[in-house]
From Swiss-Prot:
Domain of life, per lineage: Bacteria
Enzyme class: hydrolase
Cofactor(s) needed: Zn(2+)
Pfam families, alphabetized: YbeY
Name this protein carries in UniProt: Endoribonuclease YbeY
Native organism taxonomy: Bacteria, Pseudomonadati, Pseudomonadota, Gammaproteobacteria, Enterobacterales
Cross-referenced PANTHER family: ENDORIBONUCLEASE YBEY, CHLOROPLASTIC
Family classification: Belongs to the endoribonuclease YbeY family.
EC numbers: 3.1.-.-
Keywords on record: Cytoplasm, Endonuclease, Hydrolase, Metal-binding, Nuclease, Ribosome biogenesis, rRNA processing, Zinc
Organism: Blochmanniella floridana
Length: 153
């Protein structure tokens, strides 16, 4: 079980209404990293669409915003750290997807945090086989959080 979770939650969007509470997000993080025996440290940055548009363009060369981006921290081999990296979530995209797909807000927020966390751990969805594994892991974690299903799974 995770001995300690250090969550740096950065709310840098104009309107923070509808964002899950810090303690709820921390609970989700603890469930995601339940089997880890070490201290976990990560940043979750919740941004407006303009920042996400810039980040997606700057780092991935894509000219549109996305719902979540992950930036794993890869320290030099001689440095020991509990820092996993950063997850950036776009509030407006999450809200749009909630309305479009008639999704309960907390489930979608949890899903994006799970998705971003799995990327920090090295999982991806580039090929179909990896996408299936990642989707199965996401659904399993969603269920451990007490939700029956998830938006895109």
């Amino acid at each position: 079980m995770v001995s300690r979770v250090i969550l740096n939650l950065q709310l840098v969007c104009a309107n923070t209404q509808g964002i899950p509470a810090n303690n709820k997000i921390k609970l989700w993080i603890k469930k995601i990293f339940f089997s880890s025996k070490k201290k976990i440290e990560l940043t979750i940055r919740i941004v407006d669409i303009q920042e996400m548009l810039y980040l997606n363009w700057y780092y991935l060369g894509k000219k549109y915003p996305t719902n979540v981006l992950s930036f794993p921290f890869e320290p030099p081999s001689e440095i020991q750290t509990s820092l996993l990296g950063d997850i950036v979530i776009c509030k407006q995209i999450i809200e749009y997807e909630n309305r479009k797909n008639n999704i309960f807000s907390d489930v979608h927020w949890a899903h994006m945090i799970i998705h971003g966390s799995l990327h920090l751990l090295g999982y991806d969805h580039i090929c179909d086989e990896d996408a299936e594994l990642m989707n199965a892991m996401e659904l399993n974690i969603i269920r451990t959080l007490g939700y029956k299903t998830c938006c895109f799974l």
